Each structure stands twice: as structure tokens, then as C-alpha cells.
Regions:
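Structural preference for beta-strand elements that scaffold enzyme active sites
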Residues: 11-16, 58-62, 118, 160
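Short, structured motif recognition centered on aromatic/hydrophobic residues
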Residues: 113-121, 135, 140, 154, ...
Length: 232
């Protein structure tokens, strides 16, 4: 990187990027089959781009990714992943090299996660009894029910499990699509609103769910696999 910093920025006309996991194998095979987006591997891509940005370079960034999964994947999803990775990469660069010329969106900083607040299962009334029995065997106790919905709260120390047997809404739709499964995960963060805003600017789909009397409005995004990821 220090050598790159000595190059005049106007002498660099194009930058191609790729990341990859560190795997001990033939270099050519590794390069052709295991590349991934910046930030998804083990290579010092941030350090490399910090050096490039420090030269005053303000030209295009290109992704050159050879990967067996990408070849058979959805072009739209791959393009979104690539866009997200570039925005995230350059946000990291800007925070370490503030005097750069590359145009970068001003997004909130990375969130600090303090833990999992709860995990919510969607299931039917019949299957809920079996799940509750399993939780009881594992040492969980029934801590209460939702004020207006068919949701039971099970707890063991700081671990919170919710069993949702609603017959409408997102949880029920998830049950119809996947059967008994995790539909919702909530994480404790420093600032839920800014966490969701960062996710939105990185391409995540924000989700607003209807709330009734006495219910909290918890910021959320659509997670991997279509589930809900909430922030508290």
C-alpha cells in the first residue's frame, strides 16, 4: 500500500477489485473459483483502497469476481451485493482517509451489537405444544403472553424465545411458506434507527409492521431468506 500511495492519482485510470478467503491452494484455481465481493473475504481490500484513494484517484471502481456460485446465481441479487459491498468498502475507507476525492454517500457508522434480544418462531397451535415442551426440557420457563396476539414468551436467564401462532400477518405467511421455523430475530444495538438507516443505504429492504395498543414499533429490515431482522 505504501508504494501505491506514491503514485500520482492522475496516472491511475481504472481500478478492479475482488476479495477472497485465504485458502492454501493453487493460485490460478483459487483466483478462478473463489473470489467474492470486497469485505466478504480475508484480503486487505480496505488497506488497498485507502492507498489508492490517498493518491487522489477519483475514477471508476470495477468488480472482477470469478466464483462458481455467482455464475449460477441471480444477476440482480449479485449486482445488489456488489453495489452494497462497494458502498460499505468506501465508507470504511472514508472513515480512515477523510481527504479523498471519490464520491461516497454519507451513511451512519457500523452498529455495535450487544446481543440477541429475542428469537421468534412461527408455528401452528398443534406444533406449538411440542415446541413448548422441548423448551421446558431445555430449562426455559413460560414468562408470559403478548398483550393482544397469540405469542408466548419463554425465557431462560437472558435468552428470550417467542412462539407465534397467529393466523394472519407476517409470521403466519412465513409459516405457510416454510412451516415451523424462525421468522424473526431481534438484536440489541446502540441506535436502532441509525442501524436501520445504514442498512437501507446499503440496499436492505426496510419493513414497517402494523402495531396495536400497547405494542412497540420495532425498526426492522428484511433479512437473509426473507425473515425479519429487528433492532432494539
Amino acid at each position: 500500500p505504501q508504494t501505491i500511495r506514491g503514485i500520482p492519482g492522475d496516472k491511475i485510470f481504472f481500478v478492479q477489485l475482488a476479495d477472497a478467503p485465504k485458502i492454501d491452494m493453487d493460485l490460478f484455481y483459487w483466483s478462478r473459483h473463489f473470489r467474492n465481493m470486497p469485505g466478504e473475504g480475508d484480503l486487505p481490500v480496505v488497506e488497498f483502497m485507502r492507498a489508492v484513494a490517498a493518491t487522489g484517484y477519483d475514477g471508476p471502481l470495477s468488480l472482477e469476481i470469478f466464483n462458481d456460485q455467482f455464475r449460477g446465481g441471480s444477476p440482480v441479487e449479485i449486482a445488489r451485493d456488489g453495489h452494497r459491498s462497494l458502498i460499505g468498502l468506501m465508507d470504511d475507507v472514508r472513515r480512515n482517509e477523510p481527504d479523498i476525492r471519490l464520491p461516497i454517500p454519507d451513511i451512519p457508522p457500523r452498529a455495535h451489537c450487544h446481543g440477541v434480544e429475542f428469537i421468534e418462531f412461527t408455528t401452528s397451535e398443534e406444533e406449538a405444544a411440542d415446541l413448548a415442551a422441548l423448551l421446558a426440557v431445555m430449562g426455559f420457563t413460560h414468562a408470559g403472553n403478548h398483550v393482544s396476539k397469540q405469542v408466548a414468551h419463554w425465557r431462560q436467564n437472558d435468552i428470550n424465545i417467542l412462539i407465534n401462532t397467529e393466523e394472519s400477518g407476517f409470521a403466519h405467511s412465513a409459516y405457510q411458506a416454510h412451516g415451523a421455523s424462525v421468522c424473526d430475530i431481534a438484536l440489541r444495538v446502540d441506535d436502532a434507527a441509525r442501524t436501520v438507516e445504514r442498512a437501507r443505504m446499503l440496499g436492505a429492504e426496510t419493513v414497517t409492521t402494523p402495531t396495536g395498543d400497547g405494542e412497540l414499533s420495532i425498526p426492522a429490515i428484511r433479512g437473509v431468506g426473507g425473515g425479519m431482522m429487528r433492532f432494539i
